[in-house]
UniProtKB/Swiss-Prot annotation:
Domain of life: Archaea
Molecular function via GO: lyase activity; nucleic acid binding; tRNA-intron endonuclease activity
Record-linked Pfam families: tRNA_int_endo
Protein name: tRNA-splicing endonuclease
Functional note: Endonuclease that removes tRNA introns. Cleaves pre-tRNA at the 5'- and 3'-splice sites to release the intron. The products are an intron and two tRNA half-molecules bearing 2',3' cyclic phosphate and 5'-OH termini. Recognizes a pseudosymmetric substrate in which 2 bulged loops of 3 bases are separated by a stem of 4 bp.
Organism: Picrophilus torridus (strain ATCC 700027 / DSM 9790 / JCM 10055 / NBRC 100828 / KAW 2/3)
Keywords: Lyase, tRNA processing
Xref: NCBIfam families: endA, PRK09300.1-5
Subunit structure: Homodimer.
Active site positions, chain numbering: 222, 229, 257
Length: 284
């Protein structure tokens, strides 16, 4: 039997072991006719474990992609590589699920992320630690039914104050409700950006919507009352680097909140939730 890496390199199996031993124990490679075939990441994994010997400098892959692969294999999963993704399952009898590898510097559009058929991601950070994320398209709903029909704006000394607004709208300023730019544009029905569209839609969906500036987000939202804990931070996304998204998820987690990313698809506001996962097996 020939032992071949997909790039054409030949290797030997150490200690008299057979291909079936490596396939069963390490879940690597497959036999085609009279050839035991490995991809370069499987070969590098076995090489580092001192299970195969190769004379040539054969590995020319992405080291972070390899480290993601090694982490998945080390978690006891069955792993196949498909382009820039891993197909993973917990056992021989379970179904494969796609786990997409996300380089830190990949630029994504919201539409790309929203329409992605993967809902599990793995990235390797600058300290070479593997981190998992889940993505879910969600239809978020609050429980407020606020009435703005009688609301108006009073301009005094260059400041804008809300009149006849819900108690949460604006901030208290000597007994008046001082408005921010989003609130002013909302009452004036003046939409200047997609972020304004998201702001208006969140209120329509029954949320209290407040600034998320101190959390590095566009908004923080409450389902019913500001006396409750704000569960979600909301960011608007058009295009972003993956590391910016991952950082926002981490910051939300650090303040015991979850991150919702919003965007516009076919002129409609839509939402996805992205969270860090400690154990990938819980969602496979």
């Amino acid at each position: 039997m020939d032992y071949i890496i997909e790039d054409g390199f030949h290797f030997d199996i150490k200690n008299g072991k057979s291909p079936s031993y490596l396939i069963n124990k390490y879940r690597t490679g497959h036999v085609i006719g009279n050839v035991y075939l490995l991809n370069k990441y499987e070969a590098f994994y076995l090489y580092l474990k001192n299970k195969i010997s190769i004379d040539d400098e054969f590995f020319n892959g992405n080291i972070k992609f390899y480290m993601a692969y090694e982490n998945l294999i080390g978690s006891g999963l069955y792993v196949k590589i498909l382009n820039d993704c891993f197909m993973c399952r917990k056992s021989r009898n379970s179904r494969y699920k796609k786990v997409r590898f996300m380089p830190d510097d990949i630029l994504l559009s919201f539409k790309d992320l929203y329409s992605d058929d993967s809902n599990i991601y793995i990235t390797v950070d600058e300290e070479y630690e593997s981190v998992y994320y889940s993505m879910e398209r969600i239809d978020i709903k609050g429980s407020r039914k606020d009435d703005f029909s009688a609301a108006s704006i009073d301009v005094s000394s260059g400041a804008y104050f809300g009149m006849n607004c819900p108690e949460w709208f604006g901030i208290d300023f000597h007994g008046k409700r001082l408005l921010n730019d989003y609130e002013i544009r909302f009452l004036n029905n003046d939409v200047k950006s997609n972020v304004d569209v998201i702001y208006k839609d969140l209120i329509k969906r029954g949320f209290i919507v407040k600034s998320g500036f101190k959390y590095g987000s566009n908004f923080r939202i409450y389902k019913n009352s500001m006396n409750e804990h704000s569960d979600y931070l909301v960011n608007y996304m058009d295009h972003d680097l993956w590391y910016v998204i991952a950082r926002a998820v981490r910051l939300a987690s650090n303040v015991r909140k979850r991150l919702i990313i919003s965007g516009i698809i076919d002129n409609d506001p839509v939402y996805i939730k992205i969270e860090r996962i400690k154990d990938i097996k819980t969602i496979l």
